[in-house]
Amino acid sequence: LIERMQQELDDLRMFMDIGEGTITVSETEDKDWVNNWKNFFHQFYIDDLLVTPSWEEVKPEDQGRKILHIDPGTAFGTGMHETTQLCIRQLKKYITPQTELLDVGTGSGILAIVALMYGAGHAVGTDLDPCATEAVRENMEMN
């Protein structure tokens, strides 16, 4: 497979500059990559909203606050990415009971769920990732 890929790169060079075009193969340590990321995802605030992973307990001092429980599973969407946080801040600012939201590429459902938490009348999420459906269902139940 590597030899074939290298040949394809060499053929491509005849038409354009592809830079160095080297292929590197390495072996990675056998870990539970599906769950290992959880070691780095801890509760955090987006303004007044506490985003907390489903496997962490909410601290006593945070009880009574607006809390989003989230577990993306293998779908995308913890809320840690800056663009997600920007979207959440804008949703919080502009949501009304008349708001109808379409969340394309919903992943974990975080944006649709936040919209509903802040009073949107209706939210629909769609995603090509089949894992997203189960993640959204579980996250909706938690919230």
Q: Where are these predicted regions, by residue range?
A:
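N-terminal auxiliary segments of SAM/dcSAM-dependent transferases
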Residues: L1-E61
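Short, structured patches in soluble enzyme cores that scaffold and shape functional sites
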Residues: E27, P53-W55, P72, T106, ...
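Short intrinsically disordered coil segments
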Residues: F40-F41, H69, Q85
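Short, flexible hinge/linker loops that cap or flank conserved catalytic cores
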Residues: E61-D62, I95
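Short glycine/proline-enriched turns and hinge-like loops at secondary-structure junctions
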Residues: D62-Q63, H81
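A short, charged helix-loop
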Residues: K66-P72
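Conserved SAM/SAH cofactor-binding pocket of Class I
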Residues: T74, T78-N143
